[in-house]
């Protein structure tokens, strides 16, 4: 089954350069099939369900298993709000965060502009990356992360992209405000939208 890739134009250009075999015609047997959808951060996008296709699910002790598409009505498309961010202190490396209803996910983002904060108004759950307490060239410091969470005002905030330079989970939890949590593998963030 084809993989849908949603990205900015420069990312597509890099994919076509680094993985030219995946875009070559005629298709090489066994090469991936990618459908690239270009995102412009000024416009929301709708992502449609692929429930008519088989899905791969990880089963502990077995590995990945194929499952048929779920029966029932196809869910409505999800509106995705791209949030323009930058991976460095300047604006030389564009990176996008996303808002899905009342959930926002921004990783590998050093900073966003005022328009980004506008798009985050009313979000209930937000995730931001932080690799260490101190300033990092491409990630916010822990204090910058906490300031970001305070400004956004979400009900629950999660820190991802954690490194060994931050405390162990239990200790880190004790240091953080009650509504800020270190993220973990397998975390499911709730939301009605």
Residue ranges and their predicted role:
Residues 113-193:
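Binuclear metal-ion centers of metallo-dependent hydrolases, dominated by the metallo-beta-lactamase
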Residues 8, 88, 109, 162-165:
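Short beta->alpha junction loops/turns
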Residues 91-96, 100-129:
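Active-site-proximal loop/helix segments of hydrolase catalytic cores
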Residues 1-105, 171-193:
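Binuclear metal-dependent hydrolase catalytic cores
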